[in-house]
Amino acid sequence: MTVNLTTANEFIARHIGPRQEDEQHMLASLGFDSLEALSASVIPESIKGTSVLGLEDGLSEAEALAKIKAIAGQNQLFKTYIGQGYYNCHTPSPILRNLLENPAWYTAYTPYQPEISQGRLEALLNFQTLISDLTGLPIANASLLDEATAAAEAMTFCKRLSKNKGSNAFFASIHSHPQTLDVLRTRAEPLGIDVVVGDERELTDVSAFFGALLQYPASNGDVFDYRALTERFHASNALVAVAADLLALTLLTPPGEFGADVAIGSAQRFGVPLGFGGPHAAYFSTKDAFKRDMPGRLVGVSVDRFGKPALRLAMQTREQHIRREKATSNICTAQVLLANIASMYAVYHGPKGLTQIAQRIHQLTAILAKGLTALGQKVEQEHFFDTLTLNTGANTATLHDKARAQRINLRVVDAERLGVSVDETTTQADIETLWAIFADGKALPDFAANVDSTLPAALLRQSPILSHPVFNRYHSETELMRYLRKLADKDLALDRTMIPLGSCTMKLNAASEMIPVTWAEFGALHPFAPAEQSAGYLQLTSDLEAMLCAATGYDAISLQPNAGSQGEYAGLLAIRAYHQSRGEERRDICLIPSSAHGTNPATANMAGMRVVVTACDARGNVDIEDLRAKAIEHRDHLAALMITYPSTHGVFEEGIREICGIIHDNGGQVYIDGANMNAMVGLCAPGKFGGDVSHLNLHKTFCIPHGGGGPGVGPIGVKSHLTPFLPGHAAMERKEGAVCAAPFGSASILPITWMYISMMGGAGLKRASQLAILNANYISRRLEEHYPVLYTGSNGLVAHECILDLRPLKDSSGISVDDVAKRLIDFGFHAPTMSFPVAGTLMIEPTESESKEELDRFCDAMIAIREEIRAVENGTLDKDDNPLKNAPHTAAELVGEWSHPYSREQAVYPVASLIEGKYWPPVGRVDNVFGDRNLVCACPSIESYA
């Protein structure tokens, strides 16, 4: 008997949905006998053979976990007091187990379909209420990417809204976190904004500025009274943004109460691990008058068709996918998973618990300061919350080294000063250890538990916080566990059903890939810890850069961008800097096809480029002659082309090499958007067929989960001539050009992609692309008799997604794409992407992870819906009172008085398979218009649910 003794590549079958016999059946239905034959027919001849992965065989799950455990073990976990916007904290175990490690939470998509997203929408509304309460400003968004990005958004927000229209100068306090100032400078330069960094205490004339950023408390620890300064800025028609520590705001006067127009910051210390810099949820709050100019997503309270309260994403017409180059921001994701952790941290601790944590931290800091002063050490701050700057003079290096020898990290402010930041994990023993470092042999002070607060009396908070019942109920673990379960049960995520969203790649996020994320070796490392302490992360990132270079054909990778939008931005900045280095600053025209995702033109605008739109032909491809004409017309100013490949229409355009050649011949660079990379890995490589730069979505192609709307990771790959212009960071060799706060962005979720690639190997990655193409074509073929497939390649095939045209059905029956999307909920499915890239269509991307059984279940649902539409067309079903117009149907409606002309069974059990397991939407169809006309973006009163 021959026994296979190797475990190589065994994970591939776990990741890929269809079994071998199903694969053959699906291929046969398309007229092919192998995946290679299908691939050869789909991939254009001109780009075949451009991908040679060169990766080893896939490791087994056990082998990969053992290998990454060894890598993680190279990180050294010192006791860290660096601060600078990053603080160690405790992630409560019920939140860790029931939210962060729960696929019901981390595999969900952005809540664009509110009826199946009420759970995470409620958690996000809690987050917005938390931020609004603590900052004293009435409107808060559902999170941004990090504090530095939020500061950059605040700067451009102030520029748009300031009445000081003649000004291009923005004041930024020198007491801001250094990484924030770096990101501000990066964002400002292409927009022609002059960032003036200075000490606000020395400002005599503020009339030159359209806005200002102040840090509260300051990065060095000082707590300044900004009331008078804020009034001065307002008198000069400037707006004021305050970067505030959320935990400190439980004790300090909130920014909104001293006149701030915007508050921004990080919610990281609300239960989210350091993670070597991310991901963390930033926040952004502002005055009600400015709500329509606020960046990011906003959860609002509306009603469903029964008049019951229901939540939804509000004011979506602000978002970049709609406003394109006129958008106020290019950000198209939030940090939902992290915002929800912070939200539940506040729910679990409540107002008293949060205040006690803040008081304890402040008291320990005051005790530390008193003891250091007694030891003869000069403390610079009179008023502080949790951070001290110590004037250590000539002893700075000696004291720093002494601390390091005891596995303690202090912040090196400069050659003569050290910083110490106390956090939730600091103990009395830690304070005494710090005293010993500075004692130089002197007797240690007695630990006095009662030391007077050093916060200014005039700035002590008087207003209450978190009075809503949700923050005052779930304080036992039992209650919180059940609350999290109740919310999760309201939502549809990948743990229940396929999510066939086109352009979103909702594939499996395997359990083995997720396990390392919550290891302390990855989670407890400060992003500015010395390099020798982060050897594991440096190996991980080096490995990952090599893997992604192999997958894309590029020469270098930057892992810093912490979202696809930031990857786009970093890519265009690299192109811009390249042209500038050649003395061609005039090159500022960016060509973008009309079919492009709205992020593309929004990003080009942010990068200081002018957008020129090129046409698409009747088949959805780039009109090459129109592109050629516009490239020639703008050849002296052409900077770049942004193009998605395969196209947003779901096909491999055959002219891609010619398109790239046209741009290069006219002096431009080619940016290939990697949103659809899941169709290409192992089959063709953008860096080999004409791309100069691409961003990748690790949260799509490379298995990082969507988290209900973030986190994402958007690294960029570049050819060698663009390598010098990759994002830099103060903690890296290249200092300029940071696009986010941490040097490696959302570093703590990079192990997910490392695990995926290591377990799939070269053969598995190629097979995943082939199965993604097979699954999409199988759906396309099964449904084409019922719904027109809008675009195909010249051979009648699609890439990894297909677009169904529902516009004729609207004309014949009055049934809209929205009706079909909502009816799919009754069948237990998340809808495909609606009305993008073409209005009135559904774009379906099944991914390689879905089995034939699940694909058939979806196709059966779509066919059954088509039969219902046909019944409307022929009059069997009423044109207004039918299962589609009334979808989705709730359990409450089922047991209530039934007045519809169709049966209860048809409403909620339209196919027999649902009897085995039925998802019940918690609300009926949500009224979008009501929600925007009656905007409420904080927790409503309990009475409203009566």
Swiss-Prot record:
What is the top EC class of this enzyme, as a single word?
Answer: oxidoreductase
Q: Which GO terms describe its molecular function?
A: glycine binding; glycine dehydrogenase (decarboxylating) activity; pyridoxal phosphate binding
Its EC number(s): 1.4.4.2
What are the transmembrane regions?
Answer: none
In terms of domain of life, where is this protein from?
Bacteria
Acyltransferase is among the record's keywords: no
Query: Which keywords describe this protein according to UniProt?
Result: Oxidoreductase, Pyridoxal phosphate
**Reactions accelerated catalytically:** N(6)-[(R)-lipoyl]-L-lysyl-[glycine-cleavage complex H protein] + glycine + H(+) = N(6)-[(R)-S(8)-aminomethyldihydrolipoyl]-L-lysyl-[glycine-cleavage complex H protein] + CO2
| PANTHER family noted in UniProt | GLYCINE DEHYDROGENASE (DECARBOXYLATING), MITOCHONDRIAL (PTHR11773:SF1), GLYCINE DEHYDROGENASE, DECARBOXYLATING (PTHR11773)
Q: Quote the subunit structure annotation.
A: The glycine cleavage system is composed of four proteins: P, T, L and H.
Q: Which family does it belong to?
A: Belongs to the GcvP family.
Write down what this protein is called: Glycine dehydrogenase (decarboxylating)
Question: Which organism is the protein's source?
Answer: Pseudomonas fluorescens (strain SBW25)
